[in-house]
């Protein structure tokens, strides 16, 4: 058995913080898939023993794919799946050609974890529902459910893990990403530096806005509440941002930016 699949990054068209609840911030966001040059390629094979290979920037125990597999095993046990089904996860050889950067606001590790959970469910024909997959995804990381969903455009609420399909003309082929080299944003540091300016009360209105309308109406500061704190915590990012034109927007807690692809000459 060999299965190979591609996973693509997401961008946040808008990200608005509602309030802090416990240790984390409640938010609303529009997440869109971007199918451009940037992608990871994941290969899953049956082998004699488990292996996970890739150019990862963290120890195995902290890897999103590894975490997803542990959570999946526990879930299958709780649903009384057979011992042989659960053991089959211990003989997977998983290899990732890693191109999507982490700490960039693109869903770096969540992309792979969400894609893996979705595809393993298909490969092994477990017939787990989307809700069951979401229950696992939210334990891996807040963005993971977007990648499990396979939707092209979604509204994300709660801490980012509650996903709802947003019907609109997909922008997946119309956006391009700029991920600065060697500039990484710590999500934790950016959220800690966030200071609410006013109480945000227009969540319902924002969740109805088409993505294209958002990009044509607001600037990057108006769309993403995390841009200011990200610039405060990262001088290298601030230097880059100051050179960018108004057509660039900020994704997640950074450090990546994105824009609508410039219209090609000759109406191509």
Swiss-Prot record:
Matching entries from InterPro entries are given as:
GHMP_kinase_C_sf, GHMP_kinase_N_dom, IspE, Ribosomal_Su5_D2-typ_SF, Ribsml_uS5_D2-typ_fold_subgr
Q: Please tell me whether the keyword Transmembrane is annotated for this protein.
A: no
Q: So, what pathway does this thing act in?
A: Isoprenoid biosynthesis; isopentenyl diphosphate biosynthesis via DXP pathway; isopentenyl diphosphate from 1-deoxy-D-xylulose 5-phosphate: step 3/6
Annotated active site residues, numbered on this chain, are 10, 143
Q: Which one of the record's GO molecular function terms can you name?
A: ATP binding
Catalytic activities: 4-CDP-2-C-methyl-D-erythritol + ATP = 4-CDP-2-C-methyl-D-erythritol 2-phosphate + ADP + H(+)
One biological process term from GO is:
terpenoid biosynthetic process
SUPFAM superfamilies annotated for this entry?
A: GHMP Kinase, C-terminal domain, Ribosomal protein S5 domain 2-like
* Keywords for the protein's UniProt record, in alphabetical order: ATP-binding, Isoprene biosynthesis, Kinase, Nucleotide-binding, Transferase
**Alphabetized Pfam families for the sequence:** GHMP_kinases_N (PF00288)
Give the enzyme class. transferase
Look up the EC number in the record and give it: 2.7.1.148
Q: Which residues bind ATP per the record?
A: 101-111
What biological function has been recorded for the protein in this entry? Catalyzes the phosphorylation of the position 2 hydroxy group of 4-diphosphocytidyl-2C-methyl-D-erythritol.
Show the PANTHER family listed in the entry. 4-DIPHOSPHOCYTIDYL-2-C-METHYL-D-ERYTHRITOL KINASE, CHLOROPLASTIC
Q: Which family does it belong to?
A: Belongs to the GHMP kinase family. IspE subfamily.
Q: HAMAP family this protein is in?
A: IspE
* The name this protein goes by in its record: 4-diphosphocytidyl-2-C-methyl-D-erythritol kinase
- The species is Helicobacter pylori (strain ATCC 700392 / 26695)
Gene symbol here is ispE
